[in-house]
Amino acid sequence: MSFDREEDQKLKFKTSKKLKVSSTFESMNLKDDLLRGIYSYGFEAPSSIQSRAITQIISGKDVIAQAQSGTGKTATFTIGLLQAIDLRKKDLQALILSPTRELASQIGQVVKNLGDYMNVNAFAITGGKTLKDDLKKMQKHGCQAVSGTPGRVLDMIKKQMLQTRNVQMLVLDEADELLSETLGFKQQIYDIFAKLPKNCQVVVVSATMNKDILEVTRKFMNDPVKILVKRDEISLEGIKQYVVNVDKEEWKFDTLCDIYDSLTITQCVIFCNTKKKVDWLSQRLIQSNFAVVSMHGDMKQEERDKVMNDFRTGHSRVLISTDVWARGIDVQQVSLVINYDLPEIIENYIHRIGRSGRFGRKGVAINFITKADLAKLREIEKFYSIKINPMPANFAELS
């Protein structure tokens, strides 16, 4: 796995006192079969967040872990929970909650891949598709780990399709999004907490920290270990960020076509703020003979899965999406992100541009702004302590 360790090691952390840093996976005292899975997956040595958080999760302590997008957060909690699972017991022991179906499915696959030599029984449980096949497998082989979205997981718990009495660990991935009022997951997550054993270990993972996470800390966590990236380190150093002032909204399309023609890119994601604009933009580009695919939350799950699979395997090179794709989806070859609209939620900026430059790679993020967006741009710069420069005239130099 290609990984810019030099960039990763520049990260500075604020952590709980006397926190041990493990420079190798061997020093973490992991199960042999788990180590085999880690190396087969392509990891050679732990990233900065992995070297600090995995041993804390394994120790059974509650953990709040923060790191920039693409630094191996998913593998951090996955390795921790796989180490904790008792393979002799076939009942549910670990539960992972994520804000989107795509992310929950991806995490489920990571659990299976890293746990390949352990023969762990892991399932992704999300809305939008039938559970008949998964339920048959769960009943036949047992279910030791579940990655899912809050609504579907809670529904299955209430219907007693998932038994939670032996759950040892709950992971909240992209916790700031999970707990935000806008998505409406917060009460569902609180209801899930109420169904878990009181001594259940809680791991909270997020790229940003906010008051909702602090509330969960107070209510459900016991003296958590904190592993936080210093605020000025969250600007994603490996990604060149530029702004293009288009003056008027209607000029964005022509600007996008100019960039499209000028850049040599591997893969690109274009973000819009509404589903309607995603559909409009993809139709306009297709009419202009550009090859693009699109995805948003109103599409059927089968359609979203096909779009994701085509993009992940490289069959399509340009994806237009709403923020449903901004969180944690790992496609290694994305080298360019274009914010056709600046994000309405300021924390989503880091999640969007983190789609390029995954896991320490170099990437480019281009932000289109009109006069009406200037205040929002200044807000983003202030929040992340960054300065986003105008894009140079020679587009080709970015590729």
UniProtKB/Swiss-Prot annotation:
<dbReference type="Pfam" id="PF00271">
    <property type="entry name" value="Helicase_C"/>
</dbReference>
<dbReference type="InterPro" id="IPR011545">
    <property type="entry name" value="DEAD/DEAH_box_helicase_dom"/>
</dbReference>
<keyword id="KW-0690">Ribosome biogenesis</keyword>
<dbReference type="InterPro" id="IPR014014">
    <property type="entry name" value="RNA_helicase_DEAD_Q_motif"/>
</dbReference>
<protein>
    <recommendedName>
        <fullName>ATP-dependent RNA helicase FAL1</fullName>
        <ecNumber>3.6.4.13</ecNumber>
    </recommendedName>
</protein>
<dbReference type="GO" id="GO:0005524">
    <property type="term" value="F:ATP binding"/>
</dbReference>
<keyword id="KW-0378">Hydrolase</keyword>
<keyword id="KW-0547">Nucleotide-binding</keyword>
<keyword id="KW-0347">Helicase</keyword>
<dbReference type="GO" id="GO:0000462">
    <property type="term" value="P:maturation of SSU-rRNA from tricistronic rRNA transcript (SSU-rRNA, 5.8S rRNA, LSU-rRNA)"/>
</dbReference>
<feature type="short sequence motif" description="DEAD box">
    <location>
        <begin position="173"/>
        <end position="176"/>
    </location>
</feature>
<feature type="short sequence motif" description="Q motif">
    <location>
        <begin position="23"/>
        <end position="51"/>
    </location>
</feature>
<keyword id="KW-0698">rRNA processing</keyword>
<keyword id="KW-0694">RNA-binding</keyword>
<feature type="domain" description="Helicase ATP-binding">
    <location>
        <begin position="54"/>
        <end position="227"/>
    </location>
</feature>
<dbReference type="InterPro" id="IPR014001">
    <property type="entry name" value="Helicase_ATP-bd"/>
</dbReference>
<dbReference type="GO" id="GO:0003724">
    <property type="term" value="F:RNA helicase activity"/>
</dbReference>
<dbReference type="GO" id="GO:0032040">
    <property type="term" value="C:small-subunit processome"/>
</dbReference>
<dbReference type="GO" id="GO:0071013">
    <property type="term" value="C:catalytic step 2 spliceosome"/>
</dbReference>
<dbReference type="GO" id="GO:0030688">
    <property type="term" value="C:preribosome, small subunit precursor"/>
</dbReference>
<comment type="similarity">
    <text>Belongs to the DEAD box helicase family. DDX48/FAL1 subfamily.</text>
</comment>
<dbReference type="InterPro" id="IPR000629">
    <property type="entry name" value="RNA-helicase_DEAD-box_CS"/>
</dbReference>
<feature type="domain" description="Helicase C-terminal">
    <location>
        <begin position="238"/>
        <end position="399"/>
    </location>
</feature>
<dbReference type="GO" id="GO:0000398">
    <property type="term" value="P:mRNA splicing, via spliceosome"/>
</dbReference>
<dbReference type="GO" id="GO:0003729">
    <property type="term" value="F:mRNA binding"/>
</dbReference>
<dbReference type="InterPro" id="IPR001650">
    <property type="entry name" value="Helicase_C-like"/>
</dbReference>
<dbReference type="InterPro" id="IPR027417">
    <property type="entry name" value="P-loop_NTPase"/>
</dbReference>
<keyword id="KW-0067">ATP-binding</keyword>
<comment type="function">
    <text>ATP-dependent RNA helicase involved in 40S ribosomal subunit biogenesis. Required for the processing and cleavage of 35S pre-rRNA at sites A0, A1, and A2, leading to mature 18S rRNA.</text>
</comment>
<dbReference type="GO" id="GO:0097078">
    <property type="term" value="C:FAL1-SGD1 complex"/>
</dbReference>
<dbReference type="GO" id="GO:0016887">
    <property type="term" value="F:ATP hydrolysis activity"/>
</dbReference>
<dbReference type="GO" id="GO:0005730">
    <property type="term" value="C:nucleolus"/>
</dbReference>
<dbReference type="Pfam" id="PF00270">
    <property type="entry name" value="DEAD"/>
</dbReference>
<dbReference type="GO" id="GO:0030490">
    <property type="term" value="P:maturation of SSU-rRNA"/>
</dbReference>
<keyword id="KW-0539">Nucleus</keyword>
<feature type="binding site">
    <location>
        <begin position="67"/>
        <end position="74"/>
    </location>
    <ligand>
        <name>ATP</name>
    </ligand>
</feature>
